[in-house]
């Protein structure tokens, strides 16, 4: 490989690294909402998996504690799946054409 080609590859790698960092930073601003119990429990989180808000309908507060805990867990898991899917979608544009192993999640 010639020096010019190597320098070009290094510039491309550096540019891709900068683009990945920008995309990862942008994911912190994208919010998704998971819900359970027909929307009685909602979890809002960023695509960086930071929980921002949990909303519980007041009608559930007098109900069974175990059921409420299950609904919170289900809403959290729903939000997490949505955050992961959104992250993968946003990051896939940056990795198009790269030979990544199947199932590899980004950002790393």
UniProtKB/Swiss-Prot annotation:
- Signal peptide positions (record): none
Q: What is a single cellular component term in the Gene Ontology annotation?
A: bacterial nucleoid
The cysteines joined by S-S bonds are: none
Chief location: cytoplasm
Compartments it resides in: Cytoplasm, Nucleoid
A GO molecular function assigned to this protein is: DNA binding
Q: Which UniProt keywords apply?
A: Cytoplasm, DNA-binding
Q: Does the keyword DNA-binding apply?
A: yes
Any Pfam family hit:
YbaB_DNA_bd
* Cytoplasm listed as a keyword: yes
Matching InterPro entries: YbaB-like_sf, YbaB/EbfC
Query: How does this chain assemble?
Result: Homodimer.
Q: Which PANTHER family does the record associate with it?
A: NUCLEOID-ASSOCIATED PROTEIN YBAB
Function field: Binds to DNA and alters its conformation. May be involved in regulation of gene expression, nucleoid organization and DNA protection.
Q: Which family does it belong to?
A: Belongs to the YbaB/EbfC family.
Q: What is this protein called?
A: Nucleoid-associated protein BAV0915
The opening ranks of the lineage are:
Bacteria, Pseudomonadati, Pseudomonadota, Betaproteobacteria, Burkholderiales
């Amino acid at each position: 490989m010639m020096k010019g080609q190597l320098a070009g590859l290094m510039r491309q790698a550096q540019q891709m690294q900068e683009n990945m960092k920008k995309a990862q930073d942008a994911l912190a601003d994208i919010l998704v909402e998971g819900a359970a119990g027909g929307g009685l429990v909602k979890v809002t989180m960023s695509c960086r998996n930071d929980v921002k808000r949990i909303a519980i309908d007041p009608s559930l507060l007098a109900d069974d504690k175990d059921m409420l805990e299950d609904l919170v867990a289900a809403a959290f898991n729903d939000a997490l799946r949505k955050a992961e899917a959104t992250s993968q979608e946003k990051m896939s544009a940056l990795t198009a054409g790269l030979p990544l192993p199947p199932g590899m999640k980004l950002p790393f």
